[in-house]
């Protein structure tokens, strides 16, 4: 009977998020107490996909107590990350299996989003269940994974807090040197981060994909929603403000709108087939169009992106505690014979949830958790914005005032903008 210590392999996939090191530390410290050997694979699946064991060994580190004991305070990940995707071919998956077998990995912990978890489960499906167990800890600052109600993904609280500080500073700047800032916030499919930052900072407008009633968003509608808000504030003598835009608006745009954003070419994609939203330059494109319309009114507009500076911030206390619990939960799940599962926290307890139970049958991918636009939380955020509402359009004095600010007649203003109340939910 072998007395060789079990090997735990850990990797991070996808973009960074505050708290990655906390999961690594939590899992490693618990595993070491059990007498396991712990190794970290550098840059996610990148080197495992080569199938070259020597290359993998050269890019693998032993995770020891001295290395991980204090890293939970730090942003980023000490084992780095990448978007390498072994699901692109059966050969790549077999390469990963070959390397895991060569390094005698018994327990495989991946920290990432749905793509990383899907890759790990796919690799493990080609191995004997007694040969390897796979557990994933869900990670994304987008907060769009289907976790239990009111439970955020780790890193979200930190990203929202830092984003709030940045937007607060922009709001002071916008008033001090009068201008509008159009802030494009990360969030591939959902508007949780954009809305969270906007609500916390008191931004004057926030647009997220979930609030649009139609399946496809037109660029023109987004432009006019911002334009009407700018004119409403101008009518009150305020030629400045901050508008937060979820980059996920791009994911929901019509083909016509996408071609406009990407310069009449097919949108580029990442290794997992996702549109490279950053390349769309949404805030910049909107700024250019709005300046054409409002430049004669003396309105200044500056586009700003918020995203990468949030991903590697040192975690706030909530995420530091949360990620340590997830790391513990992963090892506990291994000890109890679980595999192909994600670790979640519900009612103060961490537990495994089978990966297959989180999949959307129609797409085969993990379900996306969207902002509930019928919730009180969304209504609270919306009521403090400067949008033109249906009630506003019923107020003839207000319409005349806002129209005058835009050098339009009330009739022309209403004809141009009133339909927008049917484009988004109220």
From Swiss-Prot:
Regulation: Non-allosteric.
The protein, known as: Pyrophosphate--fructose 6-phosphate 1-phosphotransferase 1
Gene: Pfk1
Active site, renumbered: 142
PANTHER family: PYROPHOSPHATE--FRUCTOSE 6-PHOSPHATE 1-PHOSPHOTRANSFERASE, PYROPHOSPHATE--FRUCTOSE 6-PHOSPHATE 1-PHOSPHOTRANSFERASE SUBUNIT BETA 2
InterPro entries, A to Z: ATP_PFK (IPR022953), Phosphofructokinase_dom (IPR000023), PKF_sf (IPR035966), PPi-PFK_TM0289 (IPR011403)
Subcellular location: Cytoplasm
Reactions mediated catalytically: beta-D-fructose 6-phosphate + diphosphate = beta-D-fructose 1,6-bisphosphate + phosphate + H(+)
Coiled coil: none
